[in-house]
Amino acid sequence: MNMKILVLVAVLCLVVSTHAERHSKTDMEDSPMIQERKYLPPGKPCYEATQKIPCCGVCSHNNCT
């Protein structure tokens, strides 16, 4: 009886660790800290309130500087 419980616990630990490892890899791939950031170069038009890609400098008079 004790051996069955021990085997069950070992199998559950293996399944949980495999599942967690798989999810940690996808989290690393989706992480914005690891992905290369994209910026608008100077001279490109920008709109501070609605732009999705930030300027590499500052958005001034609707142009990246």
Curated annotation (Swiss-Prot):
GO cellular component: extracellular region
Domain comment in the entry: The presence of a 'disulfide through disulfide knot' structurally defines this protein as a knottin.
Protein localization: Secreted
Propeptide residue intervals: 21-37
Disulfide bridge positions per record: 46-59, 55-64
Family recorded in the similarity comment: Belongs to the neurotoxin 36 family. 02 subfamily.
Keyword Hydrolase on entry: no
Function: Reversibly blocks N-type calcium channels (Cav2.2/CACNA1B) in rat dorsal root ganglion cells. Elicits no toxic symptoms in either vertebrates or invertebrates during a period of 48 hours post-injection, when it was assayed in vivo by direct injection into mice and cockroaches.
Coiled-coil zones: none
Extent of the signal sequence: 1-20
Gene Ontology MF term list: calcium channel regulator activity; toxin activity
Main location: secreted
This protein's name: Hainantoxin-X-3
Tissues in which the UniProt entry reports expression: Expressed by the venom gland.
